Regions:
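Signature for phosphate-centric chemistry
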Residues: 36-161, 169-333
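Bacterial Sec-dependent N-terminal signal peptides
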Residues: 3-38
Length: 334
């Protein structure tokens, strides 16, 4: 099992199963929605517009049983860390400071004052915990492991070796810890080992600054163009501020809209926190999702604007999946 920053899992089936075996778990980068259109999915469930901040839920799909004569014997899992707080203090402090100043000047509308209260509440909970796992995030991984254990009990027989690894980010390590503690509680006879090390980063969360600099050299102009297409803050500014002259002089409207949308998304990561759903129209939520989704496509996908090659940074991860599974199959162990 590997823990880092996305969620995907793989299950191998075979006609043999030994009592002793291996399970590999990971945590890394988020995946995108497929099937019906994104607009339709977000329309049915606006929380999905949060993108990488979506507090993922237990899947409801019915699983296809193994073919007759086959039974599960090995799991290779790669999962994102659980829900978290925003990574930097300024992500809370900048919009909060702007809103406090506007409130002192008496230019906030009733909705603007409501936004101020929500931002202040989110900032207070996150203080000193920037980038860390939330209680909801830990619970997500306990539930994930619980589902896996009960769906595939054959894989988790006594003595099975669970090799759990994470990146060195606190949120990834604590996600791994939550999952492993849950698993050990479900079967104390499992042999669970954990590792959080830079040594595993080359495949769990590989980075190549020179490669990225070469293929993302136009990042500033690309994002300015994306903002001009997807971010239209004029209506929202009128909803929040009484004085358009004040906004023109003191507010970067595009940045504020994106900052508030990010805070709206991250509000899902906590229990009982208010959100900013009253602030964005359905069209604005979809447009802002498109803006953020484009960023992922540009930086991590086959975008022609980044030479259609950024996905190749995940080669080491794919190789690890294949090599680990091949080793397990060849050894005739879980």
């Amino acid at each position: 099992i590997k823990w880092s920053n996305g969620v995907t899992s793989r299950l191998k089936f075979g006609k043999y199963m030994k009592k002793r075996g291996w399970i590999v778990l990971f945590l890394a980068f988020p995946l995108w929605m497929q099937g019906q259109s994104a607009r339709e999915e977000i329309g049915k469930n606006p929380a999905l517009a949060a993108g990488k901040y979506y507090a993922y839920q237990a899947p409801e799909e019915k699983l296809t049983p193994a073919p007759a004569g086959y039974e599960p014997f090995y799991i290779s899992m790669f999962a994102r860390h659980g829900s978290r707080y925003l990574t930097k203090e300024k992500k809370y402090a900048a919009p909060l400071s702007l809103l406090l100043e506007a409130d002192e000047e008496g230019v906030l509308t009733p909705d603007g004052k409501r936004v101020l209260k929500v931002v202040a509440s989110l900032a207070q909970e996150a203080e000193g915990r920037y980038g860390e796992l939330t209680p909801k995030g830990a619970q997500q991984h306990r539930e994930l492991i619980d589902r896996m254990f009960h769906r595939y009990p054959e894989v988790f027989s006594d003595g099975t070796h669970v090799d759990a690894r994470s990146t060195y980010k606190t949120r990834a390590f604590l996600s791994m810890a939550a999952g492993c503690v849950e698993l050990k509680g479900l079967n104390p006879k499992l042999n669970v080992t954990t590792q959080t090390s830079e040594a595993d980063a080359y495949y769990i969360k590989y980075k190549n600054p020179l490669y990225e600099a070469q293929h993302l050299e136009n990042v500033d102009s690309v994002y300015r163009a994306a903002d001009s297409v997807y971010v239209h803050p004029e209506r929202l500014m009128k909803q929040m501020f009484r004085d358009s002259v004040y906004v023109e002089k003191h507010v970067d409207a595009v940045k504020l809209m994106m900052d508030l949308f990010e805070l709206h998304g991250i509000s899902q990561s906590s229990y009982n926190q208010p959100d900013l759903s009253f602030l964005f129209t359905s069209e604005e939520q979809y447009d802002l999702w498109q803006r953020n989704n484009f960023e992922w496509y540009y930086e991590k996908g086959p975008s022609p604007l980044s030479d259609t090659c950024m996905y190749k940074l995940e080669r080491n991860l794919l190789n690890n999946f294949i090599e680990t599974a091949d080793t397990v199959i060849a050894s005739r162990k879980n």
